[in-house]
């Protein structure tokens, strides 16, 4: 009960603090609360669009009704809407249509004047209301996903939304705070950093915590056979079925780098399994002194300059930390592979077809060149082979 009462006290103070910094909160706003356990997608409730004092009463009534005084949810986030703005639906569609990626729209959207149907930015992407099928096709609002999200979110029946019939919507920014370890942590508002927590005052401790937590996550994603759980789409928590050699190796390299900060002996069995998985699955020798890392689906296999570089960075970092040269011969053959992709003038070739080694793409990604140079330098530090 004491924790519950302290939570409400702090929330009241935070709302009082916010109102002094946002002039338009004296007018209409919407309060959102996102909450849930660690192993489940959060639920999101919001007040009516009304004055802050009335919205605050509605929020606290909801908290008293839904939360147990003896046990708060694991995750709680509060959003306060401001800059509520009526915009033409066509204007919003065009903004989304012309964005380079499908997750760059940073505002919440209400789909009627009273905002009885409203979604935060994070809900819009978490429920795939805005989608992009591929990098070269325009982004769009998915009507089926929107209406499915409405049915999931609201207890009361809402009319189905037909996007072609929409004339206007109400967009908004939010100020937000995240409740963790008995305190409220302010989150950034607007633009690229929207919804991201500010850096703690002790930056060294903050960054160390980030490194340790991300290392633990990477380690947890390595399966027994050494293959990573590649990732999840945030909408519907679906597994990403693709796999990528460069990301396998760079993820391992990143995990190995964390040993500069912390020595986790319990990580080694999975790290070794993941290195072995890379060498067994992707490593192919062209001749006795030259090797390449392959990538892609069966029938579309290719050789990437960046994949060889990433593998060398992974293997040399392992040797640097452990002092063991178990994988040195693999790194040296991969280095010969890189040299085959660099002409006498220093110009690189980025992608070959496998297994005929003919040109697929002269240039693909700008960082391949720097990655390859760094990999060769890291190997030179170990074997001094000019």
PLM regions and their residue ranges:
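Post-signal peptide N-terminal segment of secreted/secretory-pathway proteins
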Residues: 42-79, 255-258, 262-276, 281
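Charged, amphipathic alpha-helical stretches
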Residues: 2-47
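Carbohydrate-binding/catalytic loop surfaces
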Residues: 227-244, 287-310, 348-371
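Extended, non-transmembrane interaction/recognition domains
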Residues: 48-209
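Active-site lining segments of carbohydrate-active enzymes
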Residues: 313-385
């Amino acid at each position: 009960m004491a924790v519950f009462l302290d939570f409400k006290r702090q929330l009241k103070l935070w709302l009082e603090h916010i109102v002094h910094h946002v002039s338009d909160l004296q007018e209409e706003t919407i309060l959102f609360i996102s909450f849930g356990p660690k192993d489940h997608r959060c639920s999101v409730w919001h007040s009516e669009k009304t004055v802050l004092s009335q919205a605050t009463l509605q929020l606290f009534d909801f908290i008293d009704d839904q939360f147990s005084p003896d046990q708060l949810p694991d995750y709680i986030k509060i959003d306060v809407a401001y800059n509520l703005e009526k915009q033409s639906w066509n204007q919003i569609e065009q903004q989304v249509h012309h964005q380079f990626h499908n997750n760059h729209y940073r505002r919440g959207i209400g789909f009627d004047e009273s905002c009885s149907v409203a979604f935060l930015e994070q809900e819009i992407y978490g429920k795939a209301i805005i989608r992009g099928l591929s990098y070269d096709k325009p982004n769009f609002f998915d009507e089926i996903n929107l209406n499915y999200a409405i049915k999931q979110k609201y207890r009361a029946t809402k009319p189905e939304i037909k996007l072609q019939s929409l004339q206007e919507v109400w967009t908004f920014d939010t100020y937000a705070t995240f409740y963790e370890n008995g305190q409220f942590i302010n989150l950034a508002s607007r633009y690229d950093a929207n919804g991201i927590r500010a850096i703690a005052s002790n930056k060294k401790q903050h960054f160390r915590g980030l490194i340790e937590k991300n290392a633990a996550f990477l380690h947890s994603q390595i399966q027994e056979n050494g293959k990573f759980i590649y990732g999840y789409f945030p909408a519907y928590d679906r597994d990403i079925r693709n796999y990528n050699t460069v990301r396998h190796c760079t993820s391992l390299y990143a995990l190995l780098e964390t040993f500069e900060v912390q020595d986790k002996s319990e990580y080694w069995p999975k790290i070794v399994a993941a290195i072995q998985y890379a060498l067994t699955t992707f490593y192919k020798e062209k001749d006795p002194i030259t090797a390449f890392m392959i990538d892609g689906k069966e029938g579309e296999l290719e050789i990437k300059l960046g994949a060889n570089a990433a593998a060398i960075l992974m293997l040399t970092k392992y040797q640097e930390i452990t002092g063991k040269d178990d994988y040195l011969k693999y790194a040296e053959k991969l280095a010969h592979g890189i040299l085959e992709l660099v002409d006498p003038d220093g110009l690189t070739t980025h992608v070959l077809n496998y297994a005929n080694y003919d040109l697929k793409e002269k240039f693909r990604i700008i960082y391949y060149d720097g990655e390859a140079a760094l990999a060769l330098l890291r190997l030179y530090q170990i074997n001094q082979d000019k």
